[in-house]
């Protein structure tokens, strides 16, 4: 009987957790979803970040389906009064998470023009071409054209997600008042580790 040392035996183990996130993805809200929004003719909370907190009262804000936009894109909610009038728009919506401590990763997919910043439950989580000055009349730090969704990984979700209802807030920036377009549309996906045991797909060399 010929012995095969273990070092010469390769086991091909197939585990979803080892081959990317897709097996455990959950969409927390989809693109095209409804958001509350506030036109940046003035600041919604007097210049501070209270507007990005979960307990802020946005009941008098209008709401509309995304994309919220003008110039580019189709459908959604059109801001026909934005050009030459205001350069920022403030957005809020809620989403639900069960067993938040188990969420290992978050991806935010955004189709945008020109820049934006994101808070979840009042915590800053992403800045893409936003302004260091968060006043209502600030501008994007760099121009960006919409057209495709881009994926942004949000780090350390366990530090700001809670069980049940969560609040995401977005501040959108245009590059200048005379810009020909503006857009914001987003989708949020969560990921959890795969706890199922790995399966043996093949043994090389085969036994015998």
Regions found by a protein language model. Give the residues of each.
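N-terminal secretory signal peptides that target proteins for export/translocation
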Residues: 1-6
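Bacterial N-terminal signal peptides
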Residues: 9-16
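Bacterial Sec-dependent signal peptides at the C-terminal "C-region" and cleavage site
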Residues: 16-26
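Extended carbohydrate-recognition surfaces in non-catalytic/accessory domains of CAZymes
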Residues: 24-103, 134-153
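Aromatic-lined ligand-binding clefts that engage carbohydrates, nucleic acids, or primary amines
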Residues: 35, 61, 95, 101-122, ...
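Short hydrophobic beta-strand segments in globular cytosolic domains
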Residues: 125-126
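An acidic-aromatic loop/edge-strand motif
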Residues: 131, 141-197
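Proline-centered linker/hinge motifs at extracellular inter-domain junctions
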Residues: 198-199, 206
